[in-house]
UniProtKB/Swiss-Prot annotation:
Record-linked Pfam families: Mab-21 (PF03281), Mab-21_C (PF20266)
Record-listed E.C. numbers: 2.7.7.-
Family of this protein: Belongs to the mab-21 family.
Gene that this sequence comes from: mab21l1
Subcellular location: Nucleus
GO MF terms, alphabetically ordered: metal ion binding; nucleotide binding; nucleotidyltransferase activity
Name of the protein in question: Putative nucleotidyltransferase MAB21L1
Organism listed in the record: Xenopus laevis
C-alpha cells in the first residue's frame, strides 16, 4: 500500500514538474501580453473619466486583481474608490449578492458616484457597468493596440478579445476590508479545527470584493433591484486558505488536468470549482500532516471523487456561501458528461499512475 502511494506521488511530482510548470510558464507569458493591452485601454479610460483609475499593478511577479479563468480567459478586477458613504447590506435574499445603500443622513451629492444611485438610494452595479462599457468601447478605438483588441458583443459584461486568442473580462469592483458578510457568518464551522484562529483572522481581515457583473443565480429573472446588486467574491481570502503543505501543488495539478481533459461542451467545469473543492478537502483533512508531500496522491484522489459526487448531484456549493450553487445554470447533460470523464481520469490515475506521462 505504501509502495503504491509512493509510486503515485512520484508520478504526480513528475507531472507537476513537467506539465504543470509548463502550463504556468505559458500562462505567465499570456498574462504579460494581455496586461499590456488592458493597461493601455484603462489608461485611455482614465483620460476620459478620472473616476475609473486603473488598479492593474504588478507586485511580486503577479498582477493585483487578475484571475485566471482558463489559459485563454482572464478576469481583471478594477478597484473603484470611495465606497464610504454606502452601507453594505447582505440579507441573504439574493444568494451570492449584496447591495450598497446610501447611509442614513448622507446626501447623494456626497458620493463620487452620484448619478449611479437609484431613486431608492442604492448604488447600481448595472449602471456603473453600463457607463464603464461605453468608456471602454471608446478607449478600444483610441488606444495604441486598437488593431489587436475588440469588444465582445452581446453581453452586458465588459469583455475584450485580444489577438483573436484571449478573452479578458474587466469588472468594476469595491474592495471591502475589515468587515465580513453576514451570509458567510457561519464560517469557520465550529466543530472543524481547520484553518485555525490565526489563519481565520487573516482571512477575515483580507475581506472580500463586490463585483459589478451579471449574477448567474438570477439569470433570466433579473428585476431592477437584482441587477443593481453586487456579486460577492473572496479571491484573496481563498488564496490564503491554500497556503501550506501540498495544497497549492494539488490545485495546480487539478487545474492542469482540467485544462487538458475536462474542457468540455457546455463548459461545466472551471478552475474555480477546483479551488473550491481543495478548500472542502482541507476541512475533511484538517491536520497539517494530511497535507504532507507524501499524501499528495490521497488528497488529489479525494478531490476527484468529491468532484464526481458534486457532478452527479448537480450541485457544488460555494465554499464561503453554501447557499450559492456553482453549477447553477449548467446543462445537466454537460454535468453528466463531466462526471463520466472525471471518473475515467480518476480511475486511470489511481490504477495506473504511469499513465500520467500521457495525460
Amino acid at each position: 500500500m505504501v509502495a503504491a502511494q509512493a509510486k503515485l506521488v512520484y508520478h504526480l511530482n513528475k507531472y507537476y514538474n513537467e506539465k504543470c510548470q509548463a502550463r504556468k510558464a505559458a500562462i505567465s507569458k499570456s498574462i504579460r501580453e494581455v496586461c499590456k493591452v488592458v493597461s493601455d485601454v484603462l489608461k485611455e479610460v482614465e483620460v476620459q473619466e478620472p473616476r475609473f483609475i486603473s488598479s492593474l499593478n504588478e507586485m511580486d511577479n503577479r498582477y493585483e486583481g487578475l484571475e485566471v479563468i482558463s489559459p485563454t480567459e482572464f478576469e481583471v478586477v478594477l478597484y473603484l474608490n470611495q465606497m464610504g458613504v454606502f452601507n453594505f447590506v447582505d440579507d441573504g435574499s439574493l444568494p451570492g449578492c449584496a447591495v450598497l445603500k446610501l447611509s442614513d443622513g448622507r446626501k447623494r451629492s456626497m458620493s463620487l458616484w452620484v448619478e449611479f444611485i437609484t431613486a431608492s438610494g442604492y448604488l447600481s452595479a448595472r449602471k456603473i457597468r453600463s457607463r464603464f462599457q461605453t468608456l471602454v468601447a471608446q478607449a478600444v478605438d483610441k488606444c495604441s493596440y486598437r488593431d489587436v483588441v475588440k469588444m465582445v458583443a452581446d453581453t452586458s459584461e465588459v469583455k475584450l478579445r485580444i489577438r483573436e486568442r484571449y478573452v479578458v473580462q474587466i469588472t468594476p469592483a469595491f474592495k471591502c476590508t475589515g468587515i465580513w458578510p453576514r451570509s458567510a457568518a457561519h464560517w469557520p464551522l465550529p466543530h472543524i479545527p481547520w484553518p485555525g484562529p490565526n489563519r481565520v483572522a487573516e482571512v477575515k481581515a483580507e475581506g472580500f470584493n463586490l463585483l459589478s457583473k451579471e449574477c448567474h443565480t438570477l439569470a433570466g429573472k433579473q428585476s431592477s433591484a437584482e441587477s443593481d446588486a453586487w456579486v460577492l467574491q473572496f479571491a484573496e481570502a481563498e488564496n490564503r486558505l491554500q497556503l501550506g503543505g501540498c495544497r497549492k501543488k494539488c490545485l495546480s495539478l487539478l487545474k492542469t488536468l482540467r485544462d487538458r481533459h475536462l474542457e468540455l461542451p457546455g463548459q461545466p467545469l472551471n478552475n474555480y470549482h477546483m479551488k473550491t473543492l481543495v478548500s472542502y478537502e482541507c476541512e475533511k483533512h484538517p491536520r497539517e500532516s494530511d497535507w504532507d508531500e507524501s499524501c499528495l496522491g490521497d488528497r488529489l484522489n479525494g478531490i476527484l471523487l468529491q468532484l464526481i459526487s458534486c457532478l452527479q448531484c448537480r450541485r457544488c456549493p460555494h465554499y464561503f456561501l453554501p447557499n450559492l450553487d456553482l453549477f447553477q445554470g449548467k446543462p445537466h447533460s454537460a454535468l453528466e458528461n463531466a462526471a463520466k470523464q472525471t471518473w475515467r481520469l480518476a480511475r486511470e490515475i489511481l490504477t495506473n499512475p504511469k499513465s500520467l506521462e500521457k495525460l
